[in-house]
């Protein structure tokens, strides 16, 4: 079985780590973690993140610490920025494998669970990108895995390890790091073993999580009271009811895209598990249902919010695929998903005129048919699509992102960081990282002497360099790619020295 697992693990490792450090820091979100972690290493202040000279308390410090560790090992660069996020992504897949094997007793279901999670589009995208989402999902999954092991094996120390993992989730993304695993455990026990909830250790454990993670929130409240309260209420309270209002069914639709390549099959699997009353799947069913319903009720909805439910979704889907039920429905769905992925890869290659680079992937796409492993069709299609994306499309995109060059030129003009540096007309969030300084923005007056990077027409000066730079968010990646092709939202920026 270990050989089979390695055969599955190796291509996943390729997808997660190949060209990982090739692309410059993405805008806007990745820039916050890149620059703040860099500042932590420079200043030695690891409790209060500082981005572009300003305190940033939107998220607790765990993600910044993870990036800082990467910088320590690999240097302050893009590989260091993303390495441990990719590694935690793989580890989340391994935990899903172990949990699926424990729950179902099937090695094939466990392998499929690992594949389904690891190849999920939004999951792998976030694993190759520095943000709190994958570390948060990892710690939630670790907490629930350890608790389930405690509950089934009755080993006390696993219970307390589960609480430590939950504390780390809180230090990654706030109170949800405790609320989500605690809610899953509570409702599962309510269904299966309500007397377990009477044990005092669950309430002592709640206090333990509060002590292990609450110290950072208390520290920020005491030191930066106003800034902390404003951000804490916005991030943890207003998102529930005030910031934006998305429809209740948002995630029911979003799963069809975000959980590709096995997305449609999940709904069949969910229906099958409930109809057949698959008792062994009660834990992942409660896990998915609780997270899905909680975030469906929350007014502000973002696809990554339900990513902590993905391991449970992967296990449910894998067990369905490994069963003998609804074979015709499964096979038709698998072929349909494979076809969608093949057509998407082909469309991408033709649109960007890279069709020749697609030929080596054709045998890979057809391999499941020869092996008669139809459950692997979406996995092979996803591998081809994602490998094509990381080996061809991402390097192509990088030629339209000269941020390293812009930062290098600014450092060359002012190596000692003695001049004020401005950006006018737009703010590129990764510029503080590459220029290695505070970038002044939203100003009505430029104080001389200074370096100014200005959108053409926003400031009159004699440029020493010019670049075409993108003037929108890169987080909607396929929109960004279309803008590159159509040459939209790119503007000329002038770099000037004002004396």
From Swiss-Prot:
This is Uncharacterized protein aq_1220. It comes from Aquifex aeolicus (strain VF5). It is an enzyme of class 2 (transferase). The chain crosses the membrane at residues 5-25, 79-99, 110-130, 132-152, 170-190, 203-223, 252-272, 286-306, 332-352, 354-374, 377-397. One of its GO terms (molecular function) is mannosyltransferase activity. The keyword Aminoacyl-tRNA synthetase does not apply. It holds the Pfam family PMT. Its main location: membrane. GO terms for cellular component: plasma membrane. GO terms for biological process: lipopolysaccharide biosynthetic process; protein O-linked glycosylation; response to iron(III) ion. It comes from the Bacteria. It is found in: Cell membrane. It is a multi-pass membrane protein. Its EC number is 2.-.-.-. Belongs to the glycosyltransferase 39 family. Keywords: Cell membrane, Glycosyltransferase, Membrane, Transferase, Transmembrane, Transmembrane helix.
